[in-house]
Amino acid sequence: MVCMLLLGLLPNVLAALFNYSFNWEVIIRPMTMRGIDQAEHYFQVSVIVVNTVGFSMGTALFVYLANPVSRGMADFQNGVTLSPSRLAFLRERCLMLGQYIALISVCLWVIAGPVYPLAIGALEWRDYVYFITSLAICGVIAATYPFLSVTWVCTHVLYLAFIAPGSTHAEDTALLNRIDAWKWRYLMLAGALPMLVVTLGLVLSPQVGSRTASILLGVLGFGGLAGFIVALWLFRVIQADLALLKQATWAYGTKRDFRQAYDFSDLPVVGNK
């Protein structure tokens, strides 16, 4: 669980650092130069409150969702025999953890988004554009990398422990197929991030007029390119793992599910002569 938690937190921490630095440079600093001295104080307070509450809530919620998988893995390592119903639950929960941490991250970023403008106040229209831009970039980061990294841990390390002879069903294959489809969407998000940052840099740099902000976007662009390479590697490993897990699920499936998956009603019946 600690490994998954760190893999989910790291992209969000990096996104929070970028969000703070970018908003400080393009919004708060110009506001103080315009004589709005309270903007700096309100921004600092809102950053502390939002990040403390957001990271605490996100961590607690993910620990709650991942705890059954952690306990199931501990029981497996201690030689405890797990019931088929519990194994089915653990397989589903294990595969969904990547999607859960991505949704938790995005939801918390969306909720936190309006807090900064409301706390600071006295914003110009361009400041709202910068807030939305920063939020969109951080949302992509918060969704993409936690999903791929946590899903990689689940498919590569954890899932096989919850497969036992006769315990798998057609629902397991269906969920594996869903994860197979989701991974393509997150890979496209990872690939879109560098292009989004470059486009925003070209559009916003003349408007911002800040060299530091341009450097931040440049660093994020190179970081997004490196992140895409990592995301592509995770994607390929997950793809191979899913193919193996589908074979294992089929091999350990029940005869009932085999009959449900394939319709033999049209085949001729061979009788005794």
Q: Residue locations for each model-derived region?
A:
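N-terminal sensory and localization modules of signal-transduction and trafficking proteins
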Residues: M1-F222
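Sparse, context-dependent recognition of short Cys/His-centered cofactor- or disulfide-binding micro-motifs
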Residues: H169, G223, G227, A243-K246
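Cytosolic-side ends of inner-membrane transmembrane helices, especially those
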Residues: L187, G223-Q239
